[in-house]
């Protein structure tokens, strides 16, 4: 029976020592018999199971670094001190020692990343190793040494360091994800307790490559693996279930120490990384670009509220081929499809409902257990549901502005509900074609002053990028309700003019939430928590508006 790790004085209440423990997968060093077992430090002092999230902490001087750490450590006991960010990192050592005296439960990685490996340290290898050894002496339980640095050291130097702290041997590729197995093989020739391999995802499928390495090798080695960049979000969230010992997070959105790093708050609260396991289902929003999407916030809120073991990610797909390979191999169970793929995805689906076929666009994909892909369009629900809550749709006169994908969803959905639908588009031909297909009526702009409607729906982007623009003039607004599909900004010029004309307005946020709610229902079979979803999006839009105003 394995002996329990030695407890530091004052660590009786250390929460790390009361976690569920499992054997630590320490790398067998094939070319170094002396390192085929955990280092003496690991055996004596390191918790057998580290928290899943390590916060990377930086500072412009030792006081700032340690003050940040003091504010974080209660809720985040696993930290990385980026000593290379300090102009004179040696000055931090007394403060680090004092930090551990006050916070004996903390587990800290000391990192002094060299400039040619994405860090800021420009000193000699000897000074780097000396600093890490002193950081270990001050209390840091783990130290990070780059593979390039290790190749310039004798094995005995690394072994000596391992007597004072657990050694993480790290490799970073800031350009691509390639030959990960070859990289690991090189690393295995040197003494270490953890092997950290970080690449850059240039495709979504690079995450699959990384996670396959973790799944294959984590039983033989203690690995930390993830992909950097916007497209690396999959491995940052799901890598821990593939075998990564932990992942890294930033303190706040502006303090990333690597491209694509997610904040600790988002990893825990939005993506629920502590609960991710083999049974966790994966969903995502797909587009190019997709970084602006509010869908992860709204969908993960709904999944958490309804106790669904699933996670929803933003997937920046540059090609459908890349996306579909991930759907198959991760696997991904459902997708929200955004621009530019709503039409292109159709030919890759095994079946669609008749409504989606009519519209000619798909915004929702379900992956069945047999791997087949089924397409739906929930934009119709996004239009119909808000209106049903306010008026009787049968016989209602509704003007739709636009003839694109969103307009098509509105027109066909409203015709199915018995509405009399009119279509106005800047170019007459698309409006006339849509009118013929849906058995609606196309109108010309001069006709608007003679017509009245129950509802006017703006299904164009006019008023979004340029907030001073409106698709209609004030004297052309002759309706009881004006429904603008644009949800950012929250109030468009069209909506302001409609209020001045005495019309009631329906904000685009309602369409966004209702179409998402319908997606949630299709995927889970559960009623969507509408109120929670609306609240999250409202707050997110307010925060986005405040940030934009602060930059002006």
Spans of model-derived segments:
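Phosphate/diphosphate ligand-binding glycine-rich loop within oxidoreductases
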Residues: 280-391, 489
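Active-site beta->alpha loop and helix N-cap motifs at the rims of alpha/beta catalytic domains
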Residues: 45, 50-72, 76-160, 166-168, ...
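Rossmann-like adenosine-cofactor binding region
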Residues: 436-506, 510
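NAD(P)-binding Rossmann-fold cofactor-contacting core
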Residues: 417-438
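Catalytic alpha/beta core domains of metabolic enzymes, predominantly
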Residues: 148-279
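Glycine-rich adenosine-cofactor-binding loop
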Residues: 227, 283-289, 387, 391, ...
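Adenosine-phosphate binding glycine-rich loop
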Residues: 485-552
């Amino acid at each position: 029976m394995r002996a329990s790790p030695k407890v530091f004085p004052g660590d009786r209440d250390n929460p790390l020592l009361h976690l569920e423990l499992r054997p630590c997968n320490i790398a067998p060093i094939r070319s170094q018999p002396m390192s085929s077992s955990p280092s003496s430090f690991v055996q004596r002092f390191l918790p057998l199971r580290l928290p899943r999230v390590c916060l990377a902490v930086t500072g412009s001087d030792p006081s700032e670094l340690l003050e940040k750490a003091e504010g974080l450590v209660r809720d985040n006991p696993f930290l990385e001190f980026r000593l290379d960010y300090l102009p004179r990192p040696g000055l931090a050592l007394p403060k680090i020692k004092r930090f551990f005296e006050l916070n004996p439960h903390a587990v800290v990685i000391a990192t002094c990343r060299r400039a040619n490996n994405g860090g800021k340290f420009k000193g000699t290898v000897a000074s780097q190793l000396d600093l890490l050894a002193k950081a270990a002496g001050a209390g840091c339980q783990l130290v990070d040494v780059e593979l390039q640095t290790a190749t310039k050291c004798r094995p005995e130097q690394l072994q000596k360091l391992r007597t004072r702290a657990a050694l993480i041997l790290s490799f970073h590729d800031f350009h691509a994800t390639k030959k990960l197995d070859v990289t690991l093989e090189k690393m295995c020739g040197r003494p270490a307790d953890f092997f950290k391999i970080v690449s850059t995802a240039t495709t979504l499928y690079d995450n699959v490559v990384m996670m396959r390495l973790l799944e294959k090798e984590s039983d033989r080695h203690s690995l930390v693996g993830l992909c950097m960049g916007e497209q690396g979000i999959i491995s940052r969230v799901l890598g821990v279930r593939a075998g990564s010992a932990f992942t890294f997070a930033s303190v706040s959105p502006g303090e990333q120490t690597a491209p694509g790093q997610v904040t600790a708050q988002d990893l825990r609260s939005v993506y629920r990384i502590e609960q991710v396991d083999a049974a966790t289902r994966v969903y995502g929003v797909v587009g190019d670009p997709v970084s602006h999407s509010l869908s992860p916030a709204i969908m993960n809120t709904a999944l958490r509220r309804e106790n669904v073991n699933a996670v929803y990610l933003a997937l920046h797909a540059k090609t459908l081929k890349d996306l579909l390979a991930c759907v198959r191999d991760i696997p991904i169970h459902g997708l929200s499809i955004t621009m530019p793929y709503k039409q292109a995805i159709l030919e890759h689906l095994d079946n669609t409902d008749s409504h989606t076929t009519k519209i000619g666009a798909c915004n929702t994909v379900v992956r069945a257990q047999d791997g087949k892909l089924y397409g739906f369009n929930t934009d119709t629900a996004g239009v119909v549901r808000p209106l049903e809550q306010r008026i009787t749709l049968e016989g209602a006169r509704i003007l739709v502005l636009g003839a694109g994908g969103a307009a098509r969803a509105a027109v066909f959905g409203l015709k199915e509900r018995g509405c009399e639908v009119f279509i106005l588009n800047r170019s007459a031909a698309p409006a006339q074609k849509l009118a013929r297909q849906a058995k609606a009526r196309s109108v010309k702009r001069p006709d608007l002053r003679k017509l009245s409607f129950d509802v006017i729906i703006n299904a164009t982007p006019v008023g979004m990028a340029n907030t001073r623009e409106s698709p209609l003039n004030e004297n052309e607004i002759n309706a009881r309700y004006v429904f603008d599909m644009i949800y950012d900004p929250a109030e468009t010029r069209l909506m302001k003019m409609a209020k001045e004309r005495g019309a009631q307005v329906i904000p685009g946020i309602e369409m966004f939430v209702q179409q998402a709610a319908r997606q949630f229902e299709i995927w889970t079979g559960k009623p969507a928590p509408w109120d929670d979803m609306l609240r999250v999006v409202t707050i997110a839009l307010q925060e986005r508006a405040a940030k934009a105003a602060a930059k002006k």
